[in-house]
Amino acid sequence: MIDTKLIVAIVVGVWALLFVVMMSIQKKRKSKATDYRASNADKALLHLYGKKFSIDGRDLSLFETVSGENLEKIVALPEGSHRIAGVYQSTEVSALGQNINLESEKVEFDAELEKGHSYSVAMYAYSPEERREYYKGDVPRDVLSIPLTLVKGSEDVKAYIIVYQDNVGEGEAS
């Protein structure tokens, strides 16, 4: 019969090996994202959270992108107005502590992007004003906010697609 200590030692050994491999993969991903940001400092960096994205009518797979944290996709775009379309996803925690996965239908909008800035486009269960109040004003500047409802034409807003400009320069209002 196999000794219990041997089984525990094997499990711990496999866990340690997998831990080292996953840490190495994570470090390479972070390094790649950092290099991508540095090499595209003269463009607008767009961080997208969701799936099935297209920019200016072209599928996101046609652009050079990198994956960031939390399944974000980072794409560098030239300065100017861009048409962004996609299905946005988010996870919220209910009052009972259960995770609720939110997913929008395809949402399409135009956004004006400036070079040298980083933008996050994501779905939130709260408005930019509610977030600003909660964090006592310590939030990025919201460039665009699109309220989403469960029923078309309803006044009962359930979520927002928000474009935040993450790195507002010194002296600019946030």
PLM region spans:
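Short loop/turn and low-complexity linker motifs enriched in small/turn-promoting residues
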Residues: 1-76, 87-174
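A short tyrosine-centered beta-strand micro-motif
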Residues: 80-84
